[in-house]
Amino acid sequence: GGYAISFVQRYYRLPYPEAVLLLLGRKDGRALEQAKPAATEPKSFALPQPYSNMRRVYAYLLHKRHIEREVVSYFTHEKLLYEDKHHNCVFVGLDDSGEAKHAHIRSTNSEGRVFRMNIEGSASEHCFHKNGTDKSLYVFEAPIDLLSHITLYPYGWQEHSYVACCGTSIQPVLERLRQNPKLDMVYLCLD
């Protein structure tokens, strides 16, 4: 037999036919029962604890990522961006009532490995976004891509709607379109 069959024969001390059945997921001619995933309760959402200032976030976004100060200040003032106690950028996503429902964190460390993640319990449909007044929606994978785009194309940026999917989910885009049916032009600005 092959390597796997020989291994099963030796490890389980089975004859060849039974080793093959075991590898096929059967025992004594019956299918083995598939293990059920452990039931886990969904985690409740909580924003990361903010730090007392935003020096590292501003330094990182302005000097390392070259985002315009006006753009960073706008999102900070709107309470959509802040620095957590671990000095990460926290990008906040709000629901229709203005309540935080999503947070994406990204390290400000420019050396070594980059750390980014969505906070447990985040509602993926409420990712980091900005609603505008015109009919266009710009879609990005990451919040920093969104901020970079605004920096590169500043003309009329406050009129446009933007959403960062904070990954690859389509849910944030569908939610923006549901919330604002007048949006009729979607620009996919994806890597």
Model-identified regions with their sequence ranges:
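Non-catalytic accessory segments of DNA primases and related replication-initiation nucleases
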Residues: G1-L62
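Acidic beta-strand-to-loop metal/phosphate-binding motif
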Residues: V139, L183-D191
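Phosphate-handling DNA/RNA-contact segment within nucleic-acid enzymes
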Residues: D84-Q179
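Short, basic/aromatic recognition patches
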Residues: I67-D84
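Helix N-cap/coil-helix junction residues
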Residues: L14, H66-I67, L137
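Serine endopeptidase catalytic core focused on the charge-relay Asp
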Residues: Y58-V71, L94
